[in-house]
């Protein structure tokens, strides 16, 4: 919808108390960009991208891979000026994710509800739903990869190498720490002091494939989807 701050996208028709300005919410924003980038009118998502980093939006209220989303919008509309304008803000956003949600393990943690997944089995096993989740860690890997690509586009080659190194390191951590070898599946490690995998195989365990994180032999995780 058109607002005084330009076009925004909302998933709600009635106003809801958990949404932000103009009834926006960052929870599904990545999906909005991936689907909306095919719209012929590029102004809609260009405005929407700027909205999140204009001071009006709250891009970290929920898990939201903003750099990845905006980079994939760029691949369709080739709006280099938008990338150049938002790059410093996307860098700052990623740095804040690192500051707020990454700890000494090198992994990111998130609350299941803030992942946009309501209450979960793995969240029930932790303190306040917190855990090292394949979701947020995959999103942050995607952010680092996207920032590396954006940095190259705006001629920041040294920064591109820095972000690619961050991505490579996180990819290794995801594959070592969040892959349950007994279950052949990516799982949540609930934040409850035990550093043990949740007993549940949750659909979120397939999210790393969206970002091409798993090695080929991890494809065994898909076997149960086709096991009649």
Language model feature labels by segment:
Residues 16, 29-32, 70, 124-125, ...:
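Generic preference for well-ordered secondary structure
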Residues 103, 214-215:
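Short loop/turn segments at secondary-structure transitions that flank enzyme active sites
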Residues 55-64, 98-166, 179-207:
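The feature captures the catalytic groove of carbohydrate-active enzymes
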Residues 74, 177-178:
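Calcium-binding motifs, dominated by EF-hand helix-loop-helix domains
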Residues 69, 74, 128, 193-195, ...:
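Short, functionally important structural connectors and interaction interfaces within domains
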Residues 1-92, 187, 200-211, 220, ...:
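Substrate-binding groove/exosite segments of carbohydrate-active enzymes
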Residues 1, 41-54, 80-98, 139, ...:
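Extended, well-ordered alpha-helical scaffold segments
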């Amino acid at each position: 919808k058109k607002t005084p701050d330009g076009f925004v996208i909302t998933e709600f028709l009635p106003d809801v108390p958990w949404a932000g300005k103009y009834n926006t919410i960052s929870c599904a924003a990545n999906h909005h960009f991936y689907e909306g980038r095919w719209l012929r009118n590029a102004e809609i998502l260009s405005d929407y991208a700027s909205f999140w980093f204009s001071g009006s939006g709250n891009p970290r209220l929920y898990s939201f891979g903003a750099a990845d989303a905006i980079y994939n919008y760029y691949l369709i509309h080739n709006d280099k000026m938008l990338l150049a304008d938002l790059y410093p803000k996307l860098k700052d956003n990623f740095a804040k994710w690192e500051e707020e949600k990454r700890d000494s393990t090198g992994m990111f943690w998130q609350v299941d509800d803030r992942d946009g997944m309501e209450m979960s089995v793995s969240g029930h096993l932790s303190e306040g739903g917190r855990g090292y989740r394949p979701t947020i860690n995959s999103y942050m890997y995607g952010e680092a990869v996207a920032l590396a690509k954006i940095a190259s586009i705006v001629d920041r080659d040294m920064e591109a190498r820095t972000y690619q190194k961050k991505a490579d390191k996180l990819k290794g951590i995801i594959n070592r720490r969040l892959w349950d070898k007994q279950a052949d599946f990516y799982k949540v490690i609930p934040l409850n002091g035990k550093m043990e995998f949740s007993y549940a195989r949750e659909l979120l365990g397939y999210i790393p494939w969206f970002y091409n994180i798993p090695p080929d032999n991890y494809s065994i995780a898909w076997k149960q989807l086709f096991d009649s």
